[in-house]
């Protein structure tokens, strides 16, 4: 199973949705970084369930425990183990799903591949696995902030066909956190919330798009060919549950332009830095960051587990009907915002360490 992510900043998540707990081991964190559970908890609180009526009603405090790798408030350079214990588990809600497959969920493919699966809340396929990613992302984020002043802000850009108008170059984190939708366009956020409320009452679900901007990105992150920065960013965010699409910069809209229209022309600013007049490249050229803002978008499908009756089959292949029980998000987007930020932070931190290891030696 692919439970480890990264090269120098390596992250291994563990645990199941309704098991004893979930967590992460971070290997490769530089020593002497000031780190406490408070640094991690503030990000976990943004991800936790039960925040509002738009999220799953499961009630978890998601209190984190640092088990190793930190001494007297600073990292040791040794593996950092972080644990979050599960408290509000109801495995009995999923008893029917031990035999019946949820449409568009991981149930059938897990059974086909492994011949066994944890059917209680989806086990490793549950979004609860992302607790470890968000915890590790908090550490990566702190490294990026201290080394380069890097700022990562994600927000809900679109819910179904309702799209927000947001300037990624100026959007503030406070505006994102100002409403339960995590959409900085307040008027559009109200429309999104109303739509999610309607879908929730129908025991249905809905998807959309999250946009993410990264500011103060060091020049030179990423490598040509197989380790291009945008390729690793795509892998990171596309590994999140329910993700179905990725684009960076102009993305698919760039296919409608000519080269003359699409190219980002260069100039030298007052500080002598090479800049681009536009940013259709999304901050990455040739697989390497150019110092401009990185702007990417991630598409998330509607939550697969819904309360409406659907046609499916059981493990024996017999056709049946399933109206799923359990507690689930009618829309994953508000809680996926910190997940996207975490994966972007993990990718950038790993590439930052790799860049320093390869390109910053003096001979």
Swiss-Prot record:
Task: State where NADP(+) binds.
Answer: 47, 53
Q: Could you give the cofactor binding note from the entry?
A: Reduced FMN (FMNH(2)).
Q: Which residues form a coiled coil?
A: none
Q: Name one GO cellular component term.
A: cytosol
InterPro entries with a match to the protein in the record: Chorismate_synth, Chorismate_synth_AroC_sf, Chorismate_synthase_CS
UniProt signal peptide: none
- Protein EC: 4.2.3.5
A Pfam family for this UniProt protein?
Answer: Chorismate_synt
Biological function: This reaction introduces a second double bond into the aromatic ring system.
Q: What is this protein called?
A: Chorismate synthase
List the source organism. Thermosynechococcus vestitus (strain NIES-2133 / IAM M-273 / BP-1)
- Upper taxonomic lineage: Bacteria, Bacillati, Cyanobacteriota, Cyanophyceae, Acaryochloridales
Query: What's the gene?
Result: aroC
């Amino acid at each position: 199973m692919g439970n480890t992510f990264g090269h120098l900043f390596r992250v291994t998540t563990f645990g199941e949705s309704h098991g004893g707990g979930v967590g992460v081991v971070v290997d490769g964190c530089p020593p002497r970084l000031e780190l406490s559970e408070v640094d991690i908890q503030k990000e976990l609180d943004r991800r936790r369930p039960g925040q509002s009526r738009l999220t799953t009603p499961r009630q978890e405090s998601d209190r984190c425990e640092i088990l190793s790798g930190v001494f007297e408030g600073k990292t040791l350079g040794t593996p950092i183990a972080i644990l979050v214990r599960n408290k509000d588990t109801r495995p009995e809600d999923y008893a029917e799903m031990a035999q019946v497959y949820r449409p568009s969920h991981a149930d059938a493919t897990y059974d086909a591949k492994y011949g066994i699966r944890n059917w209680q809340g989806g086990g490793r396929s549950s979004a609860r696995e992302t607790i470890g990613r968000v915890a590790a992302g908090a550490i990566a984020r702190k490294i990026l902030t201290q080394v380069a002043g890097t700022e990562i802000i994600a927000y809900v850009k679109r819910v179904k066909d309702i799209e927000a108008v947001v300037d990624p170059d100026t959007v503030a984190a406070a505006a994102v956190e100002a409403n339960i939708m995590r959409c900085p366009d307040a008027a559009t956020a109200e429309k999104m919330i109303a739509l999610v409320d309607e879908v929730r009452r129908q025991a249905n679900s809905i998807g959309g798009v999250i946009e993410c901007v990264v500011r103060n990105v060091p020049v030179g992150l990423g490598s040509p060919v197989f380790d291009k920065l945008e390729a690793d960013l795509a892998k990171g965010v596309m590994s999140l549950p329910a993700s179905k699409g990725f684009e960076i910069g102009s993305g698919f809209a760039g296919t409608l332009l000519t080269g003359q229209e699409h190219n980002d022309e260069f100039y030298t600013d007052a500080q002598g830095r090479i800049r681009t007049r536009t940013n259709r490249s999304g901050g990455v050229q040739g697989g390497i960051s150019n110092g401009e803002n990185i702007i990417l978008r991630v598409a998330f499908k509607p939550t697969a587990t819904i309360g409406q009756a659907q046609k499916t089959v059981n493990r024996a292949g017999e056709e049946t009907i399933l109206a799923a029980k359990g507690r689930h998000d009618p829309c994953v987007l508000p809680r996926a915002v910190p997940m996207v930020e975490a994966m972007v932070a993990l990718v950038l931190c790993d590439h930052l360490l790799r860049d320093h290891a390869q390109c910053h030696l003096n001979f």
